[in-house]
Structure formats: C-alpha cells, structure tokens
C-alpha cells in the first residue's frame, strides 16, 4: 500500500461530492462490458481531488471484483491490479489522487463497509459513490456516502461504522461540456416537438416527486414502528420542507389557482378547436384538388390506334 505515501488529502468532514461526465461514461462502459443483463455489480476506483470539504471526482478506472451471491462476506478485490493502475494514472496526471471507490449497487450492500475499510488504507476518509446505470426516474444517478463512527448511547456497546449520505452534483469543465453537447445532439430525437419534450419533462419530474414523497412516508412509518432509529436532523429537514409549503386555505390563493386553471383550459380548448378547423380545411382542399385532377384526366383526348387491313 505504498500508494498512499504521495497522497495529501484532507480528512475533514465531506460536505459535497462533484462527479464529472467522464466518470459516469467510464462506469457505464465498465458495467456494459462486465455485468450487463446480470445481477452483478462492478467496482472501481475514483480519482480526483479534495479541498475544503468538497470532493471533485474527475477520473476513474475499473478494478477486478468478485463476491459470493449467497455469502456477502466473501469477496475479492485485486490489490495488485489497483496499485499498478494507479501508478500508471499518476504518471499521466500527478494531480489526481485516490478519493474513494464506486459501485453500481444500485444501493448499499452488506459488505460495502468492509470494502470501504479496505480503501481507508489508501486514502483517509474515502467516499463511496453508487451509480445507478439503469435509472427508472429523472434525477442525478449518483449517491455518495462516507463512513463515520457511530457512538452508542449505552457505554457498554461498541461503536460501529455507518455510512452518512452526502449531496452530489454533476459538473464539467468546458471541454467536457462540448463533448457532452455533441453526444446529446446525436441521441436527441429531432422528430419530437419542444412542447412534447416539456410535457414529458414535467411528467417525469412529478413522478420523481411522488417517489420522494412515498420514500419519506415509508421512512416515517418505519420510525413510528420502531424499525429505524429517530434521526432529529432528518426530521428538522422535513419540518423545513413543510414550513415552505404555501397556505392553500387563503381565499386569494384559491381564486388565483382557479383563474390560472381556467385560463389554461381555455387555451387548450381554443388550440384544439383551431387544430380541428385547420384539419377540416386541409381535408376540403385535398378533396377539391383531387376533383380537379380527375377532371383534368377526363378532359385529355384519348388516342385510338389505327387498324390497317392487310
């Protein structure tokens, strides 16, 4: 583990993790090559830098990883391959250090803490970024965690490590943005109108909101049933969300919603009516054109071939 000798990474509390598009593309390619159409996950190393509580993940590479499906405590990660790859990457860019590891989860697993403890030997306070390579809803397909020691209230119980969630962002340098724009331009369906795209985006966003609300409800139910410990920080955040909700019992607000809804429904009705009238006019014009073509065909003289008697 001589890899850690040249690394200077702060062990302070991590507040945010920034993931670059190149990392996402590399991880998806790794998954498609190794574990596509299977229940397996792939694991690799994250490279980047850490400063003032922000981890900037700019690169990554795959690492051979195997685990037993029946016994999660049995797993293997190739240390020699990992250290050889890091030395080669360091020759290319000495500013990139090991900042953690990634997994295609798509959620936390029982042996993740053991794998995380392994990376503690390479970098202080590593991050785990779980990438959902097959997302079912709109949003950032990354979830980041770092491990902390949880001290039990009962002094007789030993402390244990637990994962703490940290916010993630997708950011890119100017060169990366140009590449991503070209990729999106190639995969974008030009036959879909802007209105249809906006409606689809709104619908997807509402589905995502519904999923988040259901997740909050499930968490609160588990807390009430005593299956999960009470976390005051989460409850404070939920209370802040509820405090931001508008008071819908105000008459002026109810009237404004009604007027806005009526205006939108009127626009939809007029648009449908105009579209129907235009379609009817197009049908009539086509009928008239067809009749004119038929008359023109009928008015043409018919050439009768002459028959000569032998």
UniProtKB/Swiss-Prot annotation:
InterPro entries: EIF3F/CSN6-like_C, JAMM/MPN+_dom, MPN, MPN_RPN7_8
GO molecular function: metallopeptidase activity
Keyword Acetylation on entry: yes
Alphabetical UniProt keywords: Acetylation, Proteasome
Cited SMART domains: JAB_MPN
Role played: Acts as a regulatory subunit of the 26S proteasome which is involved in the ATP-dependent degradation of ubiquitinated proteins.
Family note: Belongs to the peptidase M67A family.
Name of the protein in question: 26S proteasome non-ATPase regulatory subunit 7 homolog B
